[in-house]
UniProtKB/Swiss-Prot annotation:
PANTHER family: 3-KETO-L-GULONATE-6-PHOSPHATE DECARBOXYLASE SGBH-RELATED
Region ranges (3-hexulose-6-phosphate synthase): 165-406
Keywords: Carbohydrate metabolism, Lyase, Multifunctional enzyme
Annotated protein name in UniProt: Bifunctional enzyme Fae/Hps
The species this protein was found in: Methanosphaera stadtmanae (strain ATCC 43021 / DSM 3091 / JCM 11832 / MCB-3)
């Protein structure tokens, strides 16, 4: 077992007594064994490691070192670590051996290092014990099960919300979406509309060009005040100095920036690169671009999203192969230029009755402006679109049921 090196993590409980365990399991002869000895010999003020014991004079097997994550500042803090937390970890390790989570024949060959989180405001020793016992045993099981798998991580990375973070950072992983274009010049009206919009993950909020021109990119932060977890697009229609404008929008917490497809390839690529660097989406607005597929082929860096506008001559439009095009061109052909993760947004006189057609032709994002922001009943107008879209992705999901195999 000289090559064993596994990592486990678990969070259990609620309130100040919440338990968060990080642990490493490894051979005494390997790097974990070295770290174990080093930590015992090199104590840190406020983070003194201690051997896990089930009771005085009875250390658990395999040998386990507990390291407090939060600085121990007084004897009250120390009592929580040396009392309920230490007992919880020791018993969890012993029970993991008894239940054959840890093979009994390797307990003398391996060691565990367990990082324990104890909130200084925690009071209930029973909860400290129970939560840390459960979290430690679960973390051990996860370590030996190699949980989570890479596939699990990729499936969950854009879905979860960290309980301490308090809000969900949206990613466009499960289209379709409705993008509400706030093409306004009045901040009070903007706030009123946002408050009236349904609180749905399917809704994206666009800081329209008039808003940005009148109030600057700071208007993005004002939108964020009204809806902290929203996905916000800054419609800058960037033509030049894209890097500067993208960074300005990103600094105000924009999730995406719209770049004009009329810019030079160099300017567009610089803006797309800056979006990638800032960790936000790039949207290439193809308004008045005559040959969209060719434009995309010319770009070395592709945008995350291409925005297509309705062509008024669409009823007579066909592509080079004679295939009838949608109002927004041959969406499937355009999407093929972006790669499998590329998205298509459509705009231009979109009404609820056109949603099914747009989605059937391959659109991922439906952009609506006047129909919603010009309505006396903003919520109803938005719901006119939303009834054509699926439920929010996790409406019927019981996330905890999907975490562990039985």
């Amino acid at each position: 077992m000289s090559d064993i090196y596994e990592i486990g993590e678990a969070l259990i409980g609620d309130g100040p007594e919440l338990a968060h365990i990080d642990l490493i399991v490894g051979s005494k002869q390997g790097p974990v064994g070295t770290a174990f000895a080093t930590n015992m010999a090199s104590m840190s003020v406020g983070h003194t490691p201690l051997l896990s014991v089930i009771r005085p004079n009875l250390p658990t097997k395999p040998a386990t070192l507990i390291v407090p994550k939060v600085t121990v500042q007084n004897l009250d803090d120390a009592s929580k670590i040396f009392g309920p937390a230490q007992t919880a970890v020791g018993r969890a390790v012993a029970d993991a051996v008894e239940e054959e989570i840890i093979p009994k024949d390797i307990v003398e060959d391996i060691v565990l290092m367990v990082n324990v989180f104890i909130d200084p405001s925690a009071k209930d020793y029973r909860k400290i014990y129970q939560y840390n016992y459960g979290a430690t045993k679960l973390a051990i099981k996860r370590a030996f099960d190699k949980y989570p798998s890479v596939d699990k991580v990729l499936a969950e990375k854009d879905r979860g919300t960290h309980p301490i973070m308090g809000f969900k950072a949206m990613k466009l992983w499960n289209p379709p979406y409705l993008q509400v274009a706030l093409d306004l010049d009045n901040e009070d009206r903007m706030r009123s509309i946002i408050r009236d919009l349904p609180k749905r993950e399917r809704i994206l909020i666009e800081a329209g060009t008039p808003l940005v021109k009148k109030f600057g990119v700071e208007i993005i932060s004002k939108i964020r005040e009204e809806r902290p977890g929203a996905f916000i697009i800054a419609d800058l229609k960037t033509l030049d100095v894209g890097r500067v404008e993208v960074k300005m929008a990103a600094d105000e917490t924009a999730d995406a920036v719209a770049i004009s497809g009329l810019g030079t390839n160099e300017s567009i690529e610089k803006a797309i690169h800056e979006c990638s660097k800032q960790g936000i989406y790039s949207i290439l607005d193809m308004m008045n671009v005559s040959d969209i597929p060719s434009k995309l082929e010319e770009l070395k860096l592709k945008p995350n999203i291409v925005l297509l506008h309705r062509n008024i001559d669409s009823e007579t439009m066909r592509d080079n192969d004679g295939e009838q095009q949608s109002e927004w061109g041959n969406i499937k052909d355009i999407k093929s230029k972006l790669g499998k993760r590329g998205l298509i947004a459509v705009a231009g006189g979109v009404t609820p009755e056109k949603v099914d057609t747009a989605l059937a032709n391959g659109a991922n994002i439906i952009i609506a402006g006047r129909y919603i922001i010009g309505s006396s009943d903003v919520r109803r107008a938005a719901e006119d679109f939303l009834r054509y879209l699926p439920q929010d992705s996790d409406t019927m999901r019981l996330a905890l049921d999907e975490d562990e195999k039985i």
